């Protein structure tokens, strides 16, 4: 009735009820219980049945990865900026009749995979083929950590817990928590009061038994934030030299680079080349300001690029190169069909003409596609003039997470096979995995750009030891850093990282199953096989691919434990956001409002590769 429609209005707006075509009956009949949040019947589109019987009769589409269709990459729309279903949109029509689950080549996986005994905490194996890889019984070193609020972590060095938060497993009362955060209270209060004009709501106190509909209704729909300069954080005037910047940084970069070419300027930093560059202090150190311009991607050759919407950031895989150096091609760039030193990403339209120029006879592998759709790094726009108090740091992290979630949804919708799932299943998987994806990407950035010594949330928001303690989540920060250190120890490759991230997207499901559980299981097994195939082809493994697979899947299981503690802390600050003065953007309000009651009621079920 009206109550169900109100509770799902922002997530399933594109779903049309049809009493004659109930979608859930096309999967396993009535054996799979539907999620109460999506209990309305789903209209089944003709020629778009992602769970048709053809999947189980062995028929496959001629081209399981239809990347020649331009609509497949048409994900740069801004419709409903803060809604998951608005970004995901209705199912695309370019996927054809069949599900692309069998599109992964498994020629090198003819040997049967040994499975672990069935257990309630493992990946469901009912009605699965014998080739389904759901875990391994293997010897070797275990990298399974119990991290964060509800346990301890084994680190190479002892942990010095923050004295104000020695036991996060039993959160302190609200009054004592507020008192411990009120260092420099007057300055922090003035800063926060001025920052509430940025369009992001501050939810009030939320009781334990409040429904997701009421949770979501407490937030107001904010206007989309304006563009900010990626160098100093001031209001941007346009896209200058390929990067969204203000007029001051535009003029500075032009004069600095042209003067450097003519040897009129030779900037030197009086400190350690790590000066803070913001709106107030941008003129203090020209050397660090120029360095930040180059790191943001400014280039004199891009002066003709005037479109404001094309924001250029720092890419995950390639470190920043000085402007005067000539980029050299690497083997990875040759195999990913790119023509420049920078890989295309989910925020770039450059991939569309590249894919269109490829001969239709060429079928790209899933691993290559994942490398090309990987999102770029998002800037936090952190105000370095404000004090590093817990409320300021956590509010900035929440706003950054809201921006990253928009990228995560756009990334998910172009993952091969994901759009073949019902819209409700897509939304459910994103809601259950958003924290896992964010922390996993954070560990990768910290590994690539900070040598795992700091937490690289954004180029303008990096957590050192002091900021970790100030954030009131020191133990959790240490846990995320430990994952990054494992990346460094294992020398994780970008190809492995992208495949593991997809598996994390597919690693938490409702206990009663998804709307189309069979399609989900087929997709997950295919990506596990793809990871195995990548490990077999890697020359660095030299016959030790199973040991490598064991280590990587152990690391994925460790992420589940870490994320459980991160969610507990996130839900706590969400409920106490008004008292703690922690801001949440509307995107996170929507996701957490729907996720919180499901997780706390035990509906969510993590899928592990190994016995706990």
UniProtKB/Swiss-Prot annotation:
Stretches for region Modulating: 1-228
Stored Pfam families: Hormone_recep, zf-C4
Positions of NR C4-type zinc fingers: 229-249, 269-293
Positions contributing to aldosterone binding: 398, 404, 445, 573
Hinge: region residues: 299-349
Region (Important for coactivator binding): 410-413
Gene3D superfamilies named in the record: Erythroid Transcription Factor GATA-1, subunit A, Retinoid X Receptor
All residue ranges annotated as the NR LBD domain in the record: 350-592
Region described as Disordered: spans on this chain: 310-348
Binding site for progesterone: 398, 404, 445, 573
InterPro entries: NHR-like_dom_sf, Nucl_hrmn_rcpt_lig-bd, Nuclear_hormone_rcpt_NR3, Nuclear_hrmn_rcpt, Znf_hrmn_rcpt, Znf_NHR/GATA
Domains as described in the record: Composed of three domains: a modulating N-terminal domain, a DNA-binding domain and a C-terminal ligand-binding domain.
Family stated for the protein in its record: Belongs to the nuclear hormone receptor family. NR3 subfamily.
Function summary: Receptor for both mineralocorticoids (MC) such as aldosterone and glucocorticoids (GC) such as corticosterone or cortisol. Binds to mineralocorticoid response elements (MRE) and transactivates target genes. The effect of MC is to increase ion and water transport and thus raise extracellular fluid volume and blood pressure and lower potassium levels.
Protein name, as recorded: Mineralocorticoid receptor
